[in-house]
């Protein structure tokens, strides 16, 4: 359950929730953290030490120096979300899905006398907010009798990046990003046995930051990459409607550092890769007044540090080339820990990825990936959520 307490705190005085606490889940800490491109995600997100197409603009901009021909890339994403919730003993299932653009962009390599120089521009969706929770109480006297909570939206970035070889075996890259996205949340429910409520909140997101990266090639088969996405101040502009009353609130939160390190080795027809990604969620903080009644900036930031923890995602991936068919098969697996301390021992995600890529007429690359994860969250008292999520991606790349 993500955000209903936020709305209830604003206007519904009869609820018993504390007025001096932030919600169980803040918007910026939720959603499915994805990434860019079917090939990268087919390898489990192990792309920091590969990064040899447009999607490097997100994973490791230094890898753009490996692109030797003009490349145009686009990716479609279909997400699925299913949530079997148990609220004090009674089970209900809610599901939702959506289809969106995952990325679109172009890479321009520039002819130089020695080494490589490339520029890239495009869009990458990196977070998906699709979620649904349906609840019916199996025990009399609880705060909620039933509700249907739905959230949809996305968070992505428009980026301009460049990469250059500074030595025969070392590339560096940097990008400037404009983050943009939105979340559309609604809740229909009944509480205290008699009171019906209808609530909605729409949030626009925006901010600027930088991506930095390096890629070292100690030999023909090995690549080692490091990358970071710098922290920045995210603007959140909210418009809410609760049982016919409406209003708005604008505030800012700092988005944390993201650090990545990865390596790949490609002996013959095989390629094996591994990545580590660190997100400093404890550094998330309000930059001014909070939108929650009775919660000061200092108190809100104290509660963030108490409730959230930094995460380290570990991922492994492999790719095998079938030369007779021009086909590459892919397999990936990642462990993605929950950033909420009290989400339960089964809240960490194990994400399995399967994919393939095929070269068409030497210029067009078609990549497809399917990912799935199952996990359990116990964030709200009395509520257990067994969640299954999936993503299907299709990438088309054309090199001139």
Tell where the protein language model's regions lie, with residue ranges.
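Sec-dependent signal peptide recognition
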Residues: 2-9
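Short, charged, low-hydrophobicity "junction" segments
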Residues: 4, 44-55, 304-306, 342
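N-terminal signal peptide c-region/cleavage motif recognized by signal peptidases
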Residues: 13-15
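Outer-membrane beta-barrel porins/channels
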Residues: 19-41, 103-400
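Transmembrane beta-strand segments of Gram-negative outer membrane beta-barrel proteins
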Residues: 22-47, 65-82
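Outer-membrane beta-barrel translocator/receptor signature
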Residues: 50-59, 65-139, 152-156
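Short structured motifs
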Residues: 59-60, 302
